[in-house]
Structure formats: structure tokens, C-alpha cells
Amino acid sequence: GSEMCIRDSDKSPGIISPDFEKMDLHLPKRAVFAFLGEKRIERFVLARGGEKAGTFVSLTKDFPLWMIKADKEELCILQAPAGASAAVLLLERLYAYGVEKVVALGCCGALEKLAENVFFVVRKALRDEGTSYHYLPPARFVILDESAADIVEGVLRENHVSCESCATWSTDGFFRETKEKVKARRAEGCRVVDMECAALAACAAYRGKVFAQILFTADTLHDLSHEQRAWGKESRDKALLMGVKAAERL
């Protein structure tokens, strides 16, 4: 029939399990899932005496699993690939090998004139991607874990980083963000747009895991890089550091 298959909701386990590779891998409880460049993550980890502890292999590239010593215990850092379905494939594997709590960290587009130098802690995400529907019944938004978001906001404030709560529009159609859609999404309360948040939050909810997401606008980063006093040149490193500090508290 003409009914969209995205509406078929089924809670039963998948035929392929996320630990299908049966790797001898025991990850720590906490992880930072970073939509940032590979070299940047590697530099950040090595500068803090961290090391590579394994690799998630995918058809097109390998994703190194980095470990760093945080205040209390070890913490894992993994690069996140762009796009909801690709990102969820890796989030699932993090959870399958022992991770319980994840802070995702990434760039977003601004749907309105936003204050400069602000980081956003996502409270809800509009499900305009396909992946979340494989994890949760159809709904317009997915609500993110409230206590996790509160903790993350607290950590950012403690570190004197301006932050605000937000709703994000998670879309698969990067090049299909039309004027009308932007207007409509803004009317629904979305201040920023990203590609993965709704799917990651849905996956976490289905698996019963803790998940939070920090977003920063490309323009924010551009502005931050000129804010020498507080931020220095490596604004993205600051974002990574905040992700680590937030994950430690979850």
C-alpha cells in the first residue's frame, strides 16, 4: 500500500546485534562522541597522555577509539560520522561494548540571529530524519534526558561558557533546507539545525542509556576563534574539553 514504512513501529530485537563482531573490547562507562576532525581529536587525546585502545571498522574508514584518564576514571573519545544513520551505527557499538553515558558534541546551523559565543544544550529534537523511527514510535519530537541536560548546562556555566537550552531540527536533507521549512521550524521553536541529534537521542532512549548533546554554530566557532582572551585559537578544543568535563559528571 501507500502507507509509509517509516510508520511501522517494532520494539523487538534486531537480527544483527551491535556487538556482532564479538571484539575483545571493554569500554569505560562514559564517552564523548565528537563531530570533529580526526586530527584534532588525536592531538587533544595525545596532549593529555591518552592512547588508542581499539578501532571500530566500517566499510569506508576506521574509527579509532581513544582513551584518556579523566578526573575519576577512564573516558572514551570517538569521532562521530556525519548523518543520522552513520552516527547511530557507531553509537550502538559504543553502548554494546560497555558505554552507559554519552555526550555528543557537534556543529549546527543557526536558524535565527543567535548571540555570539554560545553553546547550546539540546532539550528536544525535531525528528526530520529517518533513523529515529527505527527506535521509537512516530512522534514529532524526541525529548532528551532532562537530568543529563541539566548536568551539562551546569558544567558549562561552572567553566564560564555561555550556554542556552535549545530545540534542534534534525534533518537528513542538508541541501533541502528551504526558506519555507526554515520558517516553519522556527515557528515550532527550533533555533538551530543539525543532522543527527534526534536519531542519537532515540537510540539512547531505546537502549536505556544516558545521552546529552552540546551544539555550537559554525559562526559561533568563527567568532570564538577571535576571542583570544578566553578561548585562544583552538575553540574546537575548548568544545572537546567541555564535552569531557560534562561526560565526567554524567
Model-predicted segments: where are they?
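Short, small-residue-biased leader/transition segments that mark boundaries at the very start
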Residues: G1-I6
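N-terminal low-complexity or amphipathic/hydrophobic leaders
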Residues: K11-T60, K69-D71
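Preference for short coil/turn "hinge" residues that link or interrupt alpha-helices
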Residues: D8-S9, E188
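Glycine-rich phosphate- or other oxyanion-binding loops that anchor nucleotides, phosphorylated ligands
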Residues: F56-L250
